[in-house]
Amino acid sequence: TFAEPDDASASGAENRWLTAFVTKVHNEIDHLTALDRQAGDGDFGTNMAAALDHYELPLRGDDRTVLTALSTSFLVRAGGTSGAVFGTFFRALAQEWPDELSVADVARAVRAGLDQVQALGGAQVGDKTVVDALSPAAAALDAADDDVDAAFATAARAAAEGVAATESSIAHRGRASYVGEAARGVPDPGALVTSWLFEAWAGVTRQLCTQSDHCN
């Protein structure tokens, strides 16, 4: 059963990228909760589940349609800062998502998402937030050439490296900032989820590229 107003299409082609992302988040809810208990107020996993648990998998529909649905899910269903941040990011991504896949156009969409997230809360790289994964991924796409497979793989690596960097930092934004040094050594769960989006994207793109020659 799909829930209005944020349901994805019940018919059409499977959206492999976003299905892979949502599946990964589903499978890691307990891990996300544990991380946030160490470096926050412990509700991050609950908020992710609230946003995504109602979806029947696989998700169906084109990227813009599913991104729009995910945006509404986070804005309507998820509580806390994470709902607003991810809802804002997915909304900007959906609004700018290209009809024809190209590295340059996707880079512009991701950059728009980053800009909206930073405008929302003012976070910068080093503040131990989603921006620590999103900003390097956006920069990697900005600098990439037209090889879709290579560009998305590079963006995924950049996001993962950004997550790793959050382990050695303390938070300067949100409730995680209240715990100070207790957050050091713990990766930011929001940055981690952001990296999974790029990881899923790169993985599905690699599969598609091995099946066709549309990537170069």
Regions flagged by a language model, labelled:
Residues T1-N216:
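N-terminal loops that bind phosphate or other acidic moieties
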